[in-house]
């Protein structure tokens, strides 16, 4: 647990530094760094999004602001989070990210929760040239898209499920039952498990 937390902190710090090096609009301003995202606060994705993702965004902004904000060219700037409820709906999620990157013109974006939402939004991040680091998406299809502004942070289905099957076999398991969600994440993991 400590090792994964340490890795997450290191990845987050690297992502922030990388994003800041790519986002020139940050250097042209002196006000707050405007960071936008859409996340499920209602609907079926809420459980995952509100446990594994949005609390981390809020904690990051709170802790950075407590230290004076993000240092941009030696000047500390506070973080201003601009967030919306994507209502666990792909169309709402896509429209919201178009607004954040297109008309709101936030300095940085944080990704939505889940493989499906990231799959839908990743091409937008590429079009608007916003670095997009996805901590809650895994999909071979996302890898195959080869989007230069989109970065997956999770292991992909085949290596994960192979390790799971090996562990279960080593512990003497003979049968495995699997319940999965009928979406990109569930289908790809189940397909990898069947191989």
Predicted regions and their residues:
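N-terminal secretory signal peptides and thylakoid transit peptides that target proteins
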Residues: 1-17
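C-terminal segment of N-terminal export signals and the immediately downstream linker at the start
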Residues: 24-38
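Extracytoplasmic "Venus flytrap"
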Residues: 36-60, 84-90, 113-116, 181-187
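Sec/Tat-exported extracytoplasmic proteins
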Residues: 39-42, 60-68, 101-104, 113, ...
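Short, solvent-exposed loop/turn and secondary-structure capping segments
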Residues: 46-50, 93-94, 121-122, 144
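Extracytoplasmic ligand/sensor domains, especially the bilobed periplasmic-binding protein
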Residues: 55, 106-195
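Signal peptide-proximal N-terminal region
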Residues: 55-80
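Short, well-structured alpha-helical segments in soluble
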Residues: 87-105, 167
